[in-house]
Structure formats: C-alpha cells, structure tokens
UniProtKB/Swiss-Prot annotation:
Lineage of the species this protein comes from: Eukaryota, Viridiplantae, Streptophyta, Embryophyta, Tracheophyta
Function: Usually encoded in the trnK tRNA gene intron. Probably assists in splicing its own and other chloroplast group II introns.
One of the record's GO cellular component terms: chloroplast
Organism: Lathyrus aphaca
Protein name: Maturase K
Family: Belongs to the intron maturase 2 family. MatK subfamily.
Length: 506
C-alpha cells in the first residue's frame, strides 16, 4: 500500500471543497474573458462599455431554476438576454463558469504535486507526445501480445455528475451542473447519443474536454487498482469493489487479507510485464505472458464499463493479437514488431554448428496513405497524391506563401523524425514542395517551368530539403557520416506537446 497514501490524502482533502459560491465571483468570468473565449457573450450591452456582467450570470442561473424555463418557444432563441431567453448565450456563459470553477481543485492538486523537485524536472519531458515512443522502444520488443482497446463513449451525463461528486463535495454546485447538462445537452432523451455529445463538444469545448478527461481519469483510477491487485480477485466477485463508496477502505482491507498468506501462490497469476498506454480515444495493453491473462483483462474492462459506468461495451471493442503478427496505429505512426532472423556459425574443435538467432525489432513507420488523404482534404494534392495548387493562398505575397509551406514541412519533419523509414516523409515533403511551386505559378499566371526559369526560385525552394540538415548540424558534429547516420536513425523531440493537424488516427 505504499503507492496509495498520496491518493487517499487527496481524497480526504477534496471533501472540504465548496465550489458553488465561486460561480457568483466576477473574477471567474474575468478569467474566461481573458482566455480569449468568445468575448461577445460576456458583454452586457453592445452600446455600453465592453465589460463582462455578473448580473447576466446571476439572472441566467436564477432562470435555470424556474420551472417555466423548460417551456421554450421557437422564437425565443433570437431574444435579447435581458428580455427573453437565448439558449446559445446561456449555454456559453454558464459553461465557461462551470469549466473554470470545476478545474480549480484539480489544478491546485496538480500544482502542489509539481512543487516537488524530482516530479517537476521529469514533468516537462513527460508532457511531450514523443516521450511515449522511447518507452515503447524499450518495452515492446520483449512482449508477445497486444490488446487494442477503444474507450467506449458516450457515457450518460448523470453518471458523470455522480462520479464527480465523489471527488468534490458540494451539493448545490452539482444540482446546478445537473440542470445545465440536462437542459442544454439531453433535453428530450434519456439516452446520451453521439450526436448530442458532438453538438455539446462544439458549443462548450472547455467543459466537454474536462468532463471527458475526468471520465477517463476515473476509469484509470480503477485500472491502477486492478493492475496491482487483480490476482487477489475472483472474477465472479470482483465487481463489488466498483461501488465507489468506501472504495479505498475496501481496497486496504483486501491488501491486508491477501498479502499475509497468499503472496507466493498468487505470483503464478500475476502479470508483472503488462504495460498500458492511452492516446486520444484509444489505449493499448501489452503483455509478455499467455493469452489467458490478456483475456482476463478483457473481461475486467468490459465489466468495469458495464457495472460502474453503465456503458454496454461490446467484446469486439477489445482485440487481442500476437504482437509479431499485428501492427497498430499510435499518434500518427504505424507500429509493428518485426522478427529479424540471423544465422551464426560456431565452431568448436572440429565440429561446426549453425545457430539461428531471432531478434525482435520495433518498426515505427510514417503512415503514407492517411497522410496523403489529409493533404488531399487540405487541398495540397488530389486523392492519389498528385500535387495541386492552393488558389486560396494566391492573394498572399510570395514570401508568405513559401513561409506557410515551409512551416508545414518543418512541423511534419519535426513530428515524424522518429520514423524507421524516411522515404514516406520525403514523399510528403516532395508533394508540399510541388504544391508550393504550383501555387506561386498560379499566382503569377504562368506555368511551373516558366515560373521557375523566370524567377530562379529553385534555390529558395531547396529549403524544403536543407533546413533539417542545418538544424541537425547545430546539434551534432558536421561530419557527413554522422548526419547520414542520423537520417537513418530515429530522433525523438521532447518539446512536442500537440499532435500535428494532419495526424489523424483511424
């Protein structure tokens, strides 16, 4: 139980948080105003001074508690916020207030944990998306099975509110949050559909992102427990622990009982080589042991979602495959473990032996087809990868056009420099280079060949291929053999905290 005291102390401290009064503090909406969210929703009147108004917020909250608020005519959506009801304005204003207020206790918890020097030093590097890949390079080559898991959604909004109540004890705040979610997200249905979630995420992105991350955090909170104590649980009885009330007490009791007499016997059912990585709406679970334990985890996840989150999860949402026979997509890369076989000749006295050695190697590949589809959607090429001009940018200056294309190439090179094979990346850069030339030729109403011959832009456009070498030469020695070796090897950057806009996981 040495891993758990921090969580238990944090759980006790959260019981004293009171968030409801913060909704009536002007500085909360000042924070939302200063974060460049849609500022027009905070203006009391366009003809007066441009200041956010707490009076509007108080009137909106009061209106939400009124019974006649549920009956809305079709013409009310265009009324002034003082004389009538405006659904979009109400939703955005209160959503921003909820998002900022509900984040406060969790931000305080994060800042207090980062005050420790060791955590703060490692936190900066761990924020990077690329920090996942060196970890996988070290671990995946020793593992045998992988489970692709799609995290189920949408979760019912009432379940979200109930889960949040276990972490923050403030009854009035959650009454208002429940009213808000039902009035603006789930008014006419008892079932939360993907369409309603999509609409809510677009109109209230900050609050939606918090609720979704909180749902994933809660599910991983149980996963940590299952990871450490799954060998103690009989499958037909373990679901009783998913009741969130007194969860920590039940967990402590379980450890005390089973750690005394069964520690040696239960090691046969433990899986010490299991690794878990979550990204976007998916996660992967890898293990070295037999498929039996992976199937055990599959049933754990399905029952967790069904018993605790009331989500009907299909078994096909979790696919278990041998790692050497299966490739999976992770944060814009294709990953697969390749078997390298080599024969070694060994001679002992007059006898010669041939020994076959099998080494597993992780291949991290740029997904060329999804990237070409993304470039085609952005109008840089057609669906088969032939570069086309970008007429929308033709009104800009030559320098701005070239600079835009260079930024895209720079970002792609920065993101995909960890690839095992760079040919796909060079093809993407080639498409962008020709698209840039065609855009410039379109602007000057000329053919590509005539434009290059007249303007002499070939040297300038070589930056698409030379900029990466210049950056690497500043970091590493200028020896040509060193640079060639770096082009063949993978380079991970620990300053990437956002995925590229052209990266889409299928």
């Amino acid at each position: 139980m040495k891993e758990y005291p921090v969580y238990l102390e944090q759980a006790r401290s959260r019981q004293q948080d009171f968030l409801y009064p913060l909704l009536f503090r002007e500085y909360i909406y000042g924070l939302a105003y200063s974060h460049n969210w849609n500022r027009s929703i905070f203006l009391e009147n366009g003809g007066y001074d441009n200041k956010y108004s707490l009076l509007i917020v108080k009137r909106l909250i009061t209106r939400m508690y009124q019974q006649n608020h549920l009956i809305i005519s079709a013409n009310d959506s265009t009324k002034n916020p003082f004389g009538g009801y405006n659904k979009n304005l109400d939703s955005q204003i209160i959503s921003e207030g909820f998002a900022i207020v509900v984040e406060i206790p969790f931000l305080l918890q994060l800042s207090s944990s980062l005050e420790e020097g060791e955590i703060l030093q490692s936190y900066q590097n761990l924020r990077s998306i690329h920090s996942i890949f060196p970890f996988l390079e070290d671990k995946l080559t020793y593992l045998n099975y992988v489970a692709d898991i799609r995290i189920p959604y949408p979760i019912h909004l009432e379940i979200l509110v109930q889960i949040l109540r276990y972490w923050v004890k403030d009854v009035p705040f959650f009454h208002l949050l429940r009213l808000f979610l039902y009035h603006f997200c789930n008014r006419n249905s008892f079932i939360t559909t993907k369409k309603s979630i999509s609409t809510f995420s677009k109109s209230n992105p900050r609050l939606f992102l918090f609720l979704y991350n909180f749902y994933v955090c809660e599910y991983e909170y149980f996963f940590v427990f299952l990871r450490t104590q799954s060998s103690h649980l009989r499958f037909q009885y373990f679901s009783v622990f998913f009741e969130r009330i007194f969860f920590d007490a039940k967990r402590e009791h379980l450890v005390k009982v089973f750690s005394k007499d069964f520690s040696y016997t239960l090691t046969l059912f433990k899986d010490p080589n299991i690794h878990y990585v979550r990204y976007q709406g998916k996660c992967i679970l890898t293990s070295k042991n037999a498929p039996f334990l992976m199937n055990k985890w599959k049933h754990y996840f399905i029952h967790l979602w069904q018993c605790f989150f009331d989500i009907w999860s299909q078994p096909r949402m979790i696919n278990i495959n041998p790692l050497s026979e299966h490739s999976f997509q992770l944060l814009g890369y294709f990953l697969n473990v390749r078997l390298n076989r080599s024969v070694v000749r060994s001679q002992m006295l007059q006898n010669t032996f041939l020994i076959e050695i099998v080494i597993q190697k992780l291949d991290i590949i740029v997904p060329i087809l999804p990237l070409i589809r993304s470039l085609a959607n952005a109008k840089f090429c057609n669906i088969v990868g032939e570069p086309i001009s970008k007429p929308v940018w033709a009104d800009s200056s030559d320098f701005d056009i070239i600079d835009r294309f260079l930024r895209i190439c720079r970002n792609l090179s920065h993101y995909y420099n960890g690839s095992s094979k760079k040919k796909s990346l060079y093809r993407i850069k080639y498409i962008l280079r020709l698209s840039c030339i065609k855009t410039l030729a379109c602007k000057h109403k000329s053919t590509v060949r005539a434009f290059l011959k007249r303007s002499g832009s070939e040297e300038l456009l070589q930056e698409f291929f030379t900029e990466e070498e210049e950056i690497l030469s500043l970091i590493f020695p200028r020896d040509s053999s060193t640079l060639q070796r770096l082009h063949r090897n993978r380079i991970w950057y620990l300053d990437i905290i956002f995925s590229n806009d052209l990266v889409h996981d299928e």
